[in-house]
Amino acid sequence: MFHPIEEALDALKKGEVIIVVDDEDRENEGDFVALAEHATPEVINFMATHGRGLICTPLSEEIADRLDLHPMVEHNTDSHHTAFTVSIDHRETKTGISAQERSFTVQALLDSKSVPSDFQRPGHIFPLIAKKGGVLKRAGHTEAAVDLAEACGSPGAGVICEIMNEDGTMARVPELIEIAKKHQLKMITIKDLIQYRYNLTTLVEREVDITLPTDFGTFKVYGYTNEVDGKEHVAFVMGDVPFGEEPVLVRVHSECLTGDVFGSHRCDCGPQLHAALNQIAAEGRGVLLYLRQEGRGIGLINKLKAYKLQEQGYDTVEANEALGFLPDLRNYGIGAQILRDLGVRNMKLLTNNPRKIAGLEGYGLSISERVPLQMEAKEHNKKYLQTKMNKLGHLLHF
């Protein structure tokens, strides 16, 4: 159904248009995408004719700053925070709307000799400013277009157009597949592009390592920072780094302040953390990776808001969704990079969560065995554990 990212990059380098599909839990739409440097009148006309949506030009922050392209509005209330700037035309265009003139304006954006006064405001080209960090920071078509351009070795700019059906509705994956076949286009997902970037780009930096005696034994603790969002993560390690080919006992644990520190009975996080450290110490070799992904990625305050909803009868999944979040926002790409830095290639993973296994394997790590980590249910977390089993697929038994 979808093509490898490498095939899409080859097509873009040849001046072809591709289709990029975003997450079904986001807009669930497809955009035509081309490199800005290959945005010929023919490409613009193709997008206008067969895409029918708004043609925009995603740009890196550097290009936007150089040309003094400011946000369209001071307070962005768009649900996806799409970063439109004021629309533009090149001053030498007439109406600015024809395929030829839109192509001319796009090419002028890439010209290093262009200055802000070369462009009229408003116009018929709609620049979008991509966030630094690209799809790893924001999983949108804007960032995907700029990431793809840079991966092609081209200037950080693209041209995109939402794809609509003939009846004016948004084209979803089944229709997009037919459109791709009809026009012989490569089609990729932003999800695959995110994975491609995690596998290709090192985004964590080892900052420090210390020896730490604990109630569970003496560990070597490695501190890391994430270059994209500045978050800090730590790995508690027993054994010699780098590890060899022999499977290593690993626990990837997401931060839970209420459970890990204060002994909350609403979850099983604290007991899981302690059990994992005990098992690693008993084996004398292993890694506990502590990721700062509080509340399955929604943050501490939002987790407390979710708890408030649970007091009103919501379960843990329903509470997240009521707050506008997915049930689980965690991403394991950064964790995989830290494990690779520690020389972990093959592991025995302490987890009840099959999605965690898939998440880590998707970044090139091998999991030879799943080691269950089920804790005894308590009065206040039994519903929580049953929901994780029934709705999130956790491998638990009651």
UniProtKB/Swiss-Prot annotation:
It holds the Pfam family GTP_cyclohydro2. GO terms for cellular component: cytosol. Residues 200-398 are annotated as: GTP cyclohydrolase II. It comes from the Bacteria. Mg(2+) 2 binds at E27, H141. Keywords: GTP-binding, Hydrolase, Lyase, Magnesium, Manganese, Metal-binding, Multifunctional enzyme, Nucleotide-binding, Riboflavin biosynthesis, Zinc. One of its GO terms (biological process) is riboflavin biosynthetic process. Mg(2+) 1 binds at E27. Catalyzes the conversion of D-ribulose 5-phosphate to formate and 3,4-dihydroxy-2-butanone 4-phosphate. Catalyzes the conversion of GTP to 2,5-diamino-6-ribosylamino-4(3H)-pyrimidinone 5'-phosphate (DARP), formate and pyrophosphate. This is Riboflavin biosynthesis protein RibBA. It comes from Bacillus subtilis (strain 168).
